[in-house]
Amino acid sequence: MKDVVFGICAVRSAGVILCLRISAAFILVLSLTGAGCSHDKADSSASETAAPQSASPATSSAKAVEPVGPALHIDAARAMQYTKEIVAFGPRWDSSKPIEQVRSYIKGKLKGVQVEEDSFVAETSAGKMPMTNIVAKFPGSKDGIIVLGSHYETNYWLRNTPFIGANDGAATSALLLAIADQLRGKKLEGYSIWIAFLDGEESFTRQWHTNDALWGSRHLAKKLQDDGASKKVKAFVLADMIGDADLDICRDENSTPWLEDLLLQAATHLGYQSHFFASTTEVEDDHIPFARAGMPVLDVIDIDYGYNNSFHHTVQDTVDKLSVESLKISGDVILETIRLINGMGDNPPPAPPQRVPS
């Protein structure tokens, strides 16, 4: 995911910080009008304003959606344990021994579930890299698919450091495993759910290059498009950086608006709205290839990790910066959002219009 900082506020992208100078007069205007940043985050442009946390959960939808299916809740303590077990393998950059161990670990936690491996060789700036997406499939009772995703590898360009990506990759992979625990053995009332553990999200160089990142998501999105499955995908929901103890999920301009509305409705219903949408920005992440392929997408992401984003892509991204409560909030809100997607009916609003980077 790309790292960008606008002025004094952080917007996440992958590996580079850019600064936009803001005049003193402009800052004065912001202070007088009450506009600006929340938790040191900025909107993606000067014309955008932070979304109030008490706002209606349906800003583009006509009315609130009724959820379908029983309410599910993750075992957040188990999700934290999974996180610790993943980082214990060490830095898991592509072509390393630990990433092979993590793949085996993920598949081992999915015993009894239909699992497919989507393996390929990526032509990266560092050479040819074998990669594998791991997709767990849980059949539903309705014709359609909801895909949940997260990346599991760490940065190749940090391979000579002890960077373990506790929040950036490990926690979200652990969260998906905890969600899988809740789905295993159940007859789902709504759409089928596919859980995709994606490889190769991070750029292979410190400076973010879209054509040298998002490898797993680009490959899987194309595969779904080529075999026609993309037409059945009702939503692709990405989780990224959601274990941060100071949890603050942003509204992403590159996500599908009605899905963002459902996410906020879910958070509000569960009493967690104070952790959502204090700021608005654009995020370039694993959801983008699926959006380009015409699928509705949602990026559930906390873009500000540490003061001024100081923990992101550093050796400070360790388990002690995370919390069980943040994992619980993120996991339960995603599960509630799934119930709301099921409640949208067979013909939810189409994905466009939404901003998708070219």
Locate predicted features:
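Acidic/histidine-rich catalytic neighborhood of metal-dependent amide-processing enzymes
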Residues: 163-266, 274, 279-282, 286-287
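Short, low-complexity, disordered segments immediately C-terminal to signal peptides
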Residues: 38-62
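Solvent-exposed loop/turn segments at secondary-structure junctions
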Residues: 92-94, 121-124, 141-142, 152-156, ...
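A non-catalytic alpha/beta surface segment that caps or lines the substrate-entry region
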Residues: 39, 70, 81-141
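C-terminal motif of bacterial Sec signal peptides marking the signal peptidase cleavage site
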Residues: 33-36
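N-terminal capping segment at the start of a domain
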Residues: 58-103, 157, 307-318, 342
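Active-site-adjacent substrate-binding region
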Residues: 70, 119-121, 235, 242-358
